């Protein structure tokens, strides 16, 4: 197994020792081999960094590493900025592991509202969520969207991507699996449009606030202050809703 890098150590020092031990069990279980083993191990440490100890301890390390590496393989090619969605029931002969649950993998630009929006899609389908893994990774891709490296120091500009894994109630009907995938793809597309519009609206609100201070209209100062305070309150509420 490759030794943890300096970046890995900084990452692991920010979480409880019990979680570090569980993550290292997952890393040891991977045994990917080949020239990209170091990348896979760095990926696993980042991937499970934010997962609670009880969720990690309740599952076999090999199953977790296989699911994560399936995510890494799935994300190897991402043309443009299009989100990726995969909904499947793991099979030992195809995926190298099995699960009593249906798995959902997504890869998208990091944006507000992602987890909540996907959660609502599951609620609409009456599907319970049993595990969420949702790291934000610094990703290096070439012009064709091919994954080159992970980490802020991978060389060249990195892009923040949200990689999400969900274990949900098992769905066995192939048509229902396809329907869920289409719904999730549409959901991620809607989030992208909403975030773009939301940012544009926030910029407009800030511009109006600035104009009230620099070039106030022909109103009483108290009225101007009331409008400015209202806009500041709206802007602050929008900001807090995505923190």
Sequence positions of predicted segments:
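Charge-rich interaction surfaces and accessory domains that mediate macromolecular binding and assembly
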Residues: 2-105, 120, 135, 174-243
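Catalytic micro-motifs at enzyme active sites that drive phosphoryl/nucleotidyl and oxygen chemistry
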Residues: 87-94, 118, 145-156
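Short glycine-rich or small-residue beta-strand-to-loop segments that form or flank ligand, phosphate
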Residues: 101-108, 163-169
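Extended amphipathic alpha-helical scaffold segments
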Residues: 106-114, 118-123
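A short acidic, glycine/proline-enriched capping/turn motif at secondary-structure boundaries
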Residues: 111-113, 137-139, 173
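Glycine-rich phosphate/pyrophosphate-binding loops
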Residues: 126-140
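Internal insertion modules embedded within essential enzymes
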Residues: 142, 146-195
